């Protein structure tokens, strides 16, 4: 370690001097000698050059001292052979893999920050060109090319098929191929050019090298440049390609006729062009030529060939119509299944009506005794909630929270939500103690807002009213349990009434004696 404020180059010179001579450099302070000895263990001399090997002695990094050598190393590690510039992390990795000096990290950062080329490249934003979808506005202006196969080798040695689809009319042309080389595909495309003319663009879902070879062949054969583009260029909507129905039917037809499937490709394409309806309810033939083809009035002429034999085109036409019906039914059934599934999901959904949040569910008011909920209380190894109290509601804030006081009358620091409170219901034993402890009753219930009346009169009124209510209710009670409860209550109340009557008698006797004394004095 280099002490704070010490020059790193001087530190390395002192280590090199110590490793070479075994003595300390004249500039070495006595307090630095121990550090020089410990640091020297990580360096070795090789061919009169100092190398840093580290604690494990597995590294082999040349020690750089002079500023010129540092700049040379930084320039070599920051720029690669291709002329590109590395960032801080990569440059630091390259420097530390072969070279060593004490301030290597800071020097690399300053070098990269000061590099003019890096600053210009950092502030330059490369905006990718926007890819615009080609608009299909006219027939035979934008065509897709798909390759299918390999199929069973036909009698004419055809193994593959090429399908050209016009994206505007959905007109298709199918031709057989012996292989899928660029020259073979280009010859098939040229034959279609001679029938319908070249389109504006041809889209293929192939690799760029193959597309470039086809463009070269088309330029050699037809003299047109860069007409074929890649499907991945984003110039066309992926859904606007060869319909899957055609591919599926062609695969099945080639499997059913392994030897002569290539003889029927023109019939298959014509059958699709005259029957395959588009969303506009017009056939591709009508879209292409603005008219319908001439077809026999009855289908009998198509089916009756040499008596009982049926023409191949009629078979293909019927098969395509059947495939369209199957596809339509499948689409309809899938739509119905989706609708049924949605209906079942809607029926199975349980509509849970959330109760509105009640800010004061118990209709608590100022002066009520309540228990407050204490949540997240750690007890018995887990968090629990419990009700503590009782407390008294001192007042209610504007936000609907209650400020409480405990039994000692001390106000709690934080307001409590009304939803975290519930009424405190006293037990029977506590109610009896309230009747007996009259002074404490008044002290505890002074906050309720009762009128200030003498203790004896207030308590006597309560007891007398309770006793009269019990007597009246006794006439109405018929069940044995109610009578037992009333008798128990009367037994508890009657001694208190007697005590209260004796107390009143003593009070009146004291008043009489005081009157007599006043008369005597007068």
From Swiss-Prot:
Gene Ontology MF annotations: nucleic acid binding
Domain spans labelled Integrase catalytic: 135-292
PROSITE patterns xref list: INTEGRASE
One BP annotation, GO: DNA integration
Phosphoserine found at: 502
Transmembrane parts of this sequence: none
Keywords recorded for this protein, A-Z: Phosphoprotein
Family annotation (SUPFAM superfamilies): Ribonuclease H-like
Pfam families: Integrase_H2C2
Source organism, top-level taxon: Eukaryota
PANTHER family, alphabetized: PROTEIN CBG26694, PROTEIN NYNRIN-LIKE
Protein name: Gypsy retrotransposon integrase-like protein 1
Native source organism of the sequence: Pongo abelii (Sumatran orangutan)
